[in-house]
Amino acid sequence: VLPEVYDQDGEPLRIGERYIIKNPLLGGGAVYLYNIGNLQCPNAVLQHMSIPQFLGKGTPVVFVRKSESDYGDVVRVMTGVYIKFFFKTSKLCVDETVWKVNDEELVVTGGNVGNENDIFKIKKTDLVIRGMKNVYKLLHCRSHLGCKNIGGNFKNGYPRLAAVDDDKDFIPFVFIKA
C-alpha cells in the first residue's frame, strides 16, 4: 500500500476535506484562484508571494476521485486525484473549479472529474523547509504522456503555476487544513 500524504498537523489528507496548498519557501505563499482578463469565471491558478500585490491567505481546495477507491478517503502518494477549488460561486461558474493544464502548460480551472488528462499526483520530497516536514511536489499526469512537475512562471506579470519539463524544477508545497 502506498504511503499517505500528510498535512502540517501530521494528519493524512482526506478526500473531500478542505486544504490550503502553500509554498513554504521564504517569499512563497498559498495557491489561489484569480480572474485575469475579465473572464466570466475566474480561472487562473496563482501563488501568493511576499510582495504587497500578491499577499493573501489562498483559496481552499478539496481533493476528489472519479470513483470509490480501495484507498478509502485518504490521499496516498502518486495516486491520481482531481484538485478542485472550494469557494462560493455563481451557478454559471460552478463547473469552473477543477484544475487542469491548458495548451500553454499553465494550471487553470475548467477541468473535469473523470477526464484522464486532468489528473494530478502528489509526490513526497526529502525537503525540510523552515521546520516543516511533509513537503511535497505536485505532478500533472496526462493519460499516456507521463507526469510533469508543477513549477511556476511569471506569465504576464502574474505568479502562475505551470507544468514544467525539467525534473529538478518544481515548487515545494505543504498542505494546511483550511
UniProtKB/Swiss-Prot annotation:
Belongs to the protease inhibitor I3 (leguminous Kunitz-type inhibitor) family. One of its GO terms (cellular component) is vacuole. This is Cysteine protease inhibitor 7. One of its GO terms (molecular function) is cysteine-type endopeptidase inhibitor activity. SUPFAM superfamilies: STI-like. Keywords: Disulfide bond, Protease inhibitor, Thiol protease inhibitor, Vacuole. Its main location: other. Inhibitor of cysteine proteases. May protect the plant by inhibiting proteases of invading organisms. It is found in: Vacuole. Transmembrane segments: none annotated. Disulfide bonds join C41-C93, C141-C147. It holds the Pfam family Kunitz_legume.
